[in-house]
Amino acid sequence: MAKEEVIEMEGVVNEVLPQTRFRVTLDNGFEITAYASGKMRKHRIRILAGDKVTVEMSPYDLTKGRINFRHKDAHQAPRPTVARRYN
């Protein structure tokens, strides 16, 4: 699939499903099932219910999508960092 055929939309995560899938309500009101992109999994970016995300969808199946960006909230408290100890 060529990159030009991808439809990008914004939405809000409603529910976290098993196997790293999410139920997302798009800005136009449709509800889809989406999964986190490989880069998000690689960098361990957490997606929680209520997060605003950008979703890529194929024009051939508009019920499934890939989350490729999680928007930061201005009023959201920063997440605590964990000090790592190496032996």
UniProtKB/Swiss-Prot annotation:
GO terms for molecular function: ribosome binding; rRNA binding; translation initiation factor activity. Residues 1-72 form the S1-like domain. The keyword RNA-binding applies. Keywords: Cytoplasm, Initiation factor, Protein biosynthesis, RNA-binding, rRNA-binding. Pfam families: eIF-1a. Its main location: cytoplasm. One of the essential components for the initiation of protein synthesis. Stabilizes the binding of IF-2 and IF-3 on the 30S subunit to which N-formylmethionyl-tRNA(fMet) subsequently binds. Helps modulate mRNA selection, yielding the 30S pre-initiation complex (PIC). Upon addition of the 50S ribosomal subunit IF-1, IF-2 and IF-3 are released leaving the mature 70S translation initiation complex. This is Translation initiation factor IF-1 2. It comes from Thiobacillus denitrificans (strain ATCC 25259 / T1). The lineage of its organism: Bacteria, Pseudomonadati, Pseudomonadota, Betaproteobacteria, Nitrosomonadales.
